[in-house]
């Protein structure tokens, strides 16, 4: 996300109207609107690999997988936010009623980049934690094969790291909320870690 807001003091309805007519995606934080930067080959490849694997696993389950063009709406007592996660999964029927955003995700995944990593780990994760339906939050590294999974347990979040290293034989990771297991290597298929970030 770009640090300087492009618009300020917009209502949520005005923001949604702006997004419906904009060729550029924006995230919304309490009336301020921020343009989003484009993604790299590595980022897009990782997100697509994960989304395809999840979609294949969830086919026929009633759960829906969305990639980076679907917003998640977060409403708190005195705050309202709209973010574009790289991947979100919702199994809640109420999300079928809102075609441009979802409010009840079970899983959110962010693919890290140099420009967004601090925000994805910090303020954005704090906002995501306020979503009652969210059971797991995953950060996928783009510099080396590593996934970090945060799982809600009561009032706290448990943390697990899964990585691909030379001393392990085809390791897997598990997303408990979706009963999904996959090889780490499959998520990084066709990824070239030597490509520049920009």
Residues covered by each model-derived region:
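Gly/Pro/Ser/Thr-rich low-complexity, intrinsically disordered segments predominantly at protein N-termini
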Residues: 1-198
């Amino acid at each position: 996300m770009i640090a300087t807001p492009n618009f300020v003091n917009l209502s949520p309805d005005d923001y949604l109207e702006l997004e419906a007519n904009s060729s550029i995606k924006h995230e919304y934080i309490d009336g301020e609107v921020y343009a989003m930067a484009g993604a790299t080959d590595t980022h897009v490849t990782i997100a697509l690999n994960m989304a395809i694997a999840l979609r294949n696993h969830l086919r026929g389950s009633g759960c829906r997988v969305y990639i980076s063009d679907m917003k998640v709406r977060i409403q708190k007592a005195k705050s309202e936010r709209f973010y574009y996660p790289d991947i979100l999964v919702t199994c809640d029927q109420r999300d079928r009623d809102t075609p441009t955003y979802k409010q009840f995700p079970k899983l959110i995944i962010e693919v890290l980049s140099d420009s967004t990593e601090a925000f994805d780990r910090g303020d954005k994760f704090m906002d995501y934690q306020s979503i009652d339906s969210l059971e797991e939050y995953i950060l996928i590294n783009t510099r080396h094969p590593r996934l970090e999974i945060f799982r809600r347990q009561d009032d706290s979040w448990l943390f697990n790291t899964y990585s691909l290293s030379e001393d392990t034989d085809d390791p897997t990771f598990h997303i408990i909320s979706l009963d999904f297991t996959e090889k780490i290597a499959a998520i990084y298929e066709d990824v070239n870690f030597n490509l520049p970030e920009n």
